[in-house]
Amino acid sequence: MSVLINKDTKVICQGFTGSQGTFHSEQAIAYGTKMVGGVTPGKGGTTHLGLPVFNTVKEAVEATGAEASVIYVPAPFCKDSILEAAFGGIKLIVCITEGIPTLDMLDAKVKCDELGVRLIGPNCPGVITPGECKIGIMPGHIHLPGKVGIVSRSGTLTYEAVKQTTDAGFGQSTCVGIGGDPIPGSNFIDILKLFQEDPQTEAIVMIGEIGGSAEEEAAAFIKANVTKPVVSYIAGVTAPPGKRMGHAGAIISGGKGTADEKFAALQDAGVKTVRSLADIGKALAELTGWEVKKA
């Protein structure tokens, strides 16, 4: 088992023939992802990377039976792309793009929720079930099929947690980057719920960052609902208030959203927190009693 995606998930790409869409689709195909086609308006009827190109998502879904779509489209057009996928019959939308206007995302998220469509992102690395399916921009080779579910607001910090769990021999069930924007399509709680219900996931790593209250809300959810061991790291311990730290959502405002507040909430929920990213693998081993693979 895994969450969201597996080896049978049929995936299309919106923005398929663009440079980003082309590069990352090639990587996904090489990884073994079941890519079945792509969408670029005006190029329908042609082929690209040996796969059919369609003018619309609806046509692509009807012809291929696609269930998931990954979006590599410039920010001003992302809202339309997300809505087209949602109304076109796609059940899982993964939007990688950064810089989408907040009001656009608000609208897109509400529509996806109404339609029962799962949206991951934007401004995220995507989703991967190691050895089976890769939807997004993460490096496939650092992943190992295994038993740790990873959910994160940061892309590169996810890769660090992945590398440590791979090196330790624990591996990952599924890794989900929820993105660093103020309005994510799916939040920590949405993904924690899936990991809690997934029999393959035996432990969870949650990587948060300063800004907003997503981690505090996740802590309350963990305290009430999650029985699996959880290790967490919060980025931005030394961040000054009022300064945006990379992501649009990573800002301490009105004295709220500091790393210390988040660490405290998580510790209160029984989560094992680490102050250094380098300690994630070690903390997992301590919490679970798993044996670390010798290098």
From Swiss-Prot:
Subunit structure, interactors included: Heterotetramer of two alpha and two beta subunits.
GO BP terms, alphabetized: nucleoside triphosphate biosynthetic process; tricarboxylic acid cycle
Record field: catalytic activity: succinate + ATP + CoA = succinyl-CoA + ADP + phosphate; GTP + succinate + CoA = succinyl-CoA + GDP + phosphate
Metabolic or biological pathway, per its Swiss-Prot or TrEMBL entry: Carbohydrate metabolism; tricarboxylic acid cycle; succinate from succinyl-CoA (ligase route): step 1/1
Residues that coordinate or bind substrate: Y159
GO molecular function: nucleoside diphosphate kinase activity; nucleotide binding; succinate-CoA ligase (ADP-forming) activity; succinate-CoA ligase (GDP-forming) activity
Highest taxon of the lineage: Bacteria
Name recorded for this polypeptide: Succinate--CoA ligase [ADP-forming] subunit alpha
UniProt xrefs under PROSITE patterns: SUCCINYL_COA_LIG_1, SUCCINYL_COA_LIG_2
The encoding gene: sucD
The keyword Nucleotide-binding is annotated on this UniProt entry: yes
Key words, A-Z: Ligase, Nucleotide-binding, Tricarboxylic acid cycle
Top EC class of this enzyme: ligase
Annotated Gene3D superfamilies: NAD(P)-binding Rossmann-like Domain (3.40.50.720), Succinyl-CoA synthetase domains (3.40.50.261)
Family to which this protein belongs: Belongs to the succinate/malate CoA ligase alpha subunit family.
GO cellular component, one term: succinate-CoA ligase complex
Function of the molecule: Succinyl-CoA synthetase functions in the citric acid cycle (TCA), coupling the hydrolysis of succinyl-CoA to the synthesis of either ATP or GTP and thus represents the only step of substrate-level phosphorylation in the TCA. The alpha subunit of the enzyme binds the substrates coenzyme A and phosphate, while succinate binding and nucleotide specificity is provided by the beta subunit. Can also generate UTP or CTP, although it preferentially synthesizes ATP and/or GTP.
Active site: H247 (tele-phosphohistidine intermediate)
A Pfam family that the UniProt record links to this protein: Ligase_CoA
EC number: 6.2.1.5
Binding site for CoA: T17, G18, S19, Q20, K43, I96, T97, E98
